Design a protein with these regions (language model features):
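Charged, alpha-helix-forming regions
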Residues: 1-229
Length: 229
């Protein structure tokens, strides 16, 4: 599969400022299988990490980063991971925080391999709609590590996507000027990166369930897209 950048300008679809965030290439290339709500939690972590690096003090009581001996505690509104959605009794949020606390991410390059859990001890205060959870130190460190490069993308655009595969492609393609070739199979292939080693094993199924859906959303919301060959 080859992904080629499209540079045509497209409207964002709303009047909100589209804040740029810088995501460590470690996170961009990490191998994991998250759903959309879990991915939105990660996007918020990236946003928190950027503000931390910039030395921007978060002034409201609804957003906090509190260092601990083994990571950081994050406080944020549950609404930060929703897409203008109704979440009765926090059902979607509880499911997302619970499932993400049971998952991890893998990163590997020529020098290192590591696996880490992501978060633990998520809590939602029902009266205020505030979520509090702990982020493991390797995850926070990876979010702050730009030594291997970074991807710059627009946060509101990323939060628009309904498919997690659209999100992953958007991260990979954002800021890409030259054509980017990403194979389907292999250690750096899409199947491995997206954690789909046992799903959509037939190429046509992978194209229909992953590539076609991602391309449709990218064409609608993003200035970047790809073609599959």
């Amino acid at each position: 599969m080859a992904a080629y950048v499209s540079t045509e300008d497209k409207p964002l679809g709303d009047n909100l400022p589209n804040k740029a965030v810088f995501q460590s290439y470690i996170w961009t290339c990490a191998k994991y299988d998250f759903n959309v709500y879990e991915k939105r939690i990660i996007y918020r972590l990236v946003e928190f990490a950027q503000r931390w690096l910039e030395g921007v003090r978060i002034k409201d009581h609804m957003h906090k980063v509190e260092p601990t001996n083994c990571g950081v505690n994050i406080t944020m509104p549950v609404a930060d991971i929703l897409r203008d959605e109704d979440d009765h009794n926090y059902t979607k949020a509880k499911a997302a925080f619970t499932s993400l606390s049971k998952k991890g991410a893998t990163y590997e390059d020529d020098n290192i391999w590591f696996y880490t859990a992501i978060i633990e001890h998520p809590k939602i205060e029902k009266n205020t709609g505030i979520a509090i959870f702990h982020v493991y130190e390797p995850v926070w460190r990876a979010a702050l590590d730009f030594t291997k490069g970074y991807r710059k993308y627009e946060l509101i655009t990323a939060m628009k996507f309904k498919s997690v595969y659209s999100m992953r492609f958007y991260e990979l393609l954002s800021g890409q000027i030259k054509p980017l070739y990403v194979p389907l199979e292999g250690p750096d292939g899409l199947r491995e990166r997206f954690g789909l080693q046992t799903k959509y094993e037939r190429v046509n199924d992978f194209k229909r369930k992953v590539l076609d859906i991602a391309k449709k959303e990218l064409d609608e919301y993003s200035p970047y897209s790809f073609v599959a060959k």
